[in-house]
A protein has these predicted regions:
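Interface elements of modular peptide-recognition networks comprising either
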Residues: 8-122
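Cleavable N-terminal signal peptides of Sec/SRP-targeted secreted and luminal proteins
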Residues: 1-9
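Extracellular carbohydrate-recognition regions
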Residues: 125
């Protein structure tokens, strides 16, 4: 018997972004529950339910960006994956030690200070 498993990409409906320590102090507005939105730069984006922040893929850096909804699709944000990790991954599959945040310059986040979790709806067919 042959099984075909097809992952259609980053289709998680609801994700949780949690920040701790200095990342939280610098970027607290980015923390919360995000809902799946339209594709941006060829990949799924998510919008924070309670304010005007979003999570999207940035092709030039091949990383995920968490920033203002006004900056959606650009390279401008307050938290980002670090090291070209977005091209073959979903943001909730990026290691918790592979993020950086802005605080008068980019700072590599300590392990587990930036956490992104898929809460609902990432079905594999």
């Amino acid at each position: 018997m042959v099984y075909l498993i097809l992952n259609l990409g980053c289709e998680c409906q609801t994700i949780a972004i949690s920040l701790k320590n200095n990342a939280l102090a610098a970027q607290s507005s980015r923390q919360g529950i995000y809902q799946r939105a339209e594709k941006v730069n060829g990949k799924t984006s998510w919008i924070l339910s309670s304010n005007s922040n979003a999570l999207w893929y940035n092709p030039p850096s091949e990383d995920w960006i968490i920033g203002s909804l006004d900056d959606l699709g650009t390279s401008t944000g307050g938290v980002a994956s670090n090291g070209n990790l977005g091209i073959s991954s979903c943001p909730y599959n990026v290691s918790e030690d592979a993020w950086k945040y802005s605080d008068n310059g980019w700072i590599i986040a300590d392990a587990n200070d930036v956490s992104i979790e898929c809460l609902t709806g990432n079905d594999i067919f």
